[in-house]
Amino acid sequence: VISHGFCESSEKYRELIKTFNKNNYSVYIIDHRGHGKSGRLGIDNSQINVEDFNYYIKDLKTFLDSIVVPNLNDRKLYLFAHSMGGAIGALFLEKHNNYFEKAILNCPMMEIDTGKYPKIVSKIVSKLFCTIGMGNKYLFGHGPFNSKPDFINSATSSRKRYDSYFNKQLEHKELQTSGGSFNWLNQAFKGIKELLKEENIQNIKADVL
């Protein structure tokens, strides 16, 4: 089971899925709410917004219970979770520790890069914006999808992979996610605080890499 990252989608994982398939793994992947072909919750098609970070965990459990588990046929279940999906995956492992035998948390979102703004300031501002009813505003420096390529500031060193996915984004509006809301940031901070609590970490039974 794959849990993708912030502003990503299942479409971005085609190459990895093929690699897993070639090694005899069946693969299931969810588009997290607000991402890919899942419903939008932001002010436009590009914005990632969520009312409660725990909704991601509930969605994943529903996906597992309704789609994945009924097709397991006594096979073991493994998790590959990246970035934001890593935080979702870690919280899931803490709350529901009887699903996965093993898990890979790839660059999990255990902290948030707040850029030029100190983390404490970002926490205060995001909470303030939510309190005064402006939680659905874009984060500073975030905005609607830009149709001009920006490989230099992307999260990959592979130009070929960047161009491949960017071209898909241009062709498919549902892939054009590009920024978060203050609601999302505020909830992400809460989710990270929860997953890093020692008593919650102790609940994990799966082998984790």
Descriptions of predicted regions:
Residues G5-E8, M84:
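Active-site glycine-rich loops that stabilize anionic/oxyanionic intermediates
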